[in-house]
A protein has these predicted regions:
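Cytochrome P450
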Residues: 1-391
């Protein structure tokens, strides 16, 4: 008898055989372990993501939700509240000139990856986490140097804890809640600093964003900033890890992008399809829905398995092949529908620059271990350690 528990460590380790069974045999599947339905086909996931009136995010969109977050953030709200938040936050993003970030991101990449020259073996997570937090601090405007409230590693550690769940219970434990509370306290202090002395950074723009006389209130600014730090560290950091994992696994693709860095743009998109770090998100039904012969009831939770939709052969031919020439339009690596990720432009730019600079120092590498330990999170997927050997 087939079973699929999205909170299982076995699913973290290798979800793709489960996804194939789901798509082929159980496209609308009730998981008794998770007490929710699972949608696994690309078309169904896209349709659900667009139909917010039926598939609501207001009860929380993370597979294990944080207290007080549901219904209050961009990812965990529905229109019209979502549209208002998105408009104000997008206004802040538009004021932060993306081109102005390119030079500092490249300087960060050179600073982080340069010391790898001459290394024989290293954990990519060590350098990718440094890069991610430094880029996030530059983009958001988190205080650094003499202004720093805490060290970068503390910010990263708390952000990563926020998205994890207990490896045994698969629920948020006291340490995860404590990390969330710490992050809110930290974000509140930064917001106060930027309101007192605004700068050209995202937190200043969030604090002061105004559209037709409407502004974000204090709680909205706090939760938006807290969520962006969490999502920025884990989404960008997780994707950096998965991209390195793919390039270390597929020699031909790695050699191609090292020889011609212009191919990195397409390789990034294929990695977002093939092995996105954003695997599964949650919705709640606002009415009964019958799909593939199954009736899901109003109030039921539904898991949208983005990672499965990206491997759906109904959408992408030969989906289990990593092909950097594929150009996978419409992939779900950054979500979709009204909740598509707002930070995609910064993420794409940062990853492209990171690997341009990384490959100048370490052009040839492979994974040391075949079997990896994976982060205990039913929402995001990335290795806890990624040891690479230089060839």
């Amino acid at each position: 008898m087939f079973a699929f528990d999205p909170y299982s460590p076995a699913v973290d380790a290798d979800p793709f055989p489960y996804y194939r069974r789901l798509r082929d045999e159980h496209p609308c599947f009730w998981s008794p372990e998770a007490q929710m339905w699972v949608l696994s086909r690309y078309a169904d996931i896209v349709s659900a993501g667009q139909d917010w009136q039926t598939y609501s995010s207001a009860s929380g969109n993370l597979m294990t939700e944080l207290p007080g977050r549901a219904g209050a953030t961009l990812g965990s709200s529905d229109p019209p509240k979502h549209d208002r938040l998105r408009g104000l936050i997008q206004h802040a993003f538009m004021k932060r000139n993306l081109l102005a970030l390119e030079e500092p991101i490249r300087a960060i990449a050179q600073q982080v990856f340069g010391p790898l020259k001459g290394a024989q073996q290293f954990d990519f997570k060590d350098v990718s986490s440094q890069f991610t937090v430094k880029v996030l601090m530059a983009a958001l405007g988190l205080p650094t140097g003499n202004e720093a409230l805490v060290d970068e590693q503390t910010v990263r550690d708390n952000a990563v804890l926020m998205v994890q769940s207990d490896a045994r219970t698969r629920a948020k434990g006291p340490e995860h809640i404590a990390a969330y509370n710490w992050m809110q306290d930290y974000a509140g202090k930064v917001i106060a600093m930027r309101r007192a002395e605004p700068r050209d950074d995202l937190i200043s723009h969030f604090s002061l964003a105004e559209v037709d006389g409407d502004r974000l209130d204090d709680r909205e600014v706090l939760l938006t900033t807290t969520t962006l730090i969490m999502a920025g560290v884990e989404s960008l950091g997780g994707f950096m890890m998965m991209f390195a994992y793919n390039l270390a696994t597929f020699d031909e693709a790695r050699r191609a992008v090292v020889a011609n860095p212009a191919l990195l743009t397409d390789a990034v998109e294929e990695s977002l399809r093939f092995n996105t770090s954003a695997q599964r998100f949650r919705r709640r039904l606002m009415k009964d829905v019958t799909l593939h012969g199954q009736t899901m009831k109003e109030g039921d939770f539904v898991c949208l398995a983005y990672g499965s939709g990206n491997r759906d052969e109904r959408q992408y031919p030969d989906p289990d092949r990593y092909d950097i020439a594929r150009k996978p339009r419409g992939h779900l690596g950054f979500g979709g529908g009204v909740h598509a990720c707002l930070g995609t432009a910064i993420a794409r730019l940062a990853v492209k620059i990171a690997f341009e600079e990384f490959h100048k120092v370490v052009p040839d590498y492979r994974r040391v271990a075949d079997q990896l330990a994976w982060m205990p999170s039913s929402t995001f997927r990335s290795p806890l350690v990624l040891d690479l050997a230089v060839q």
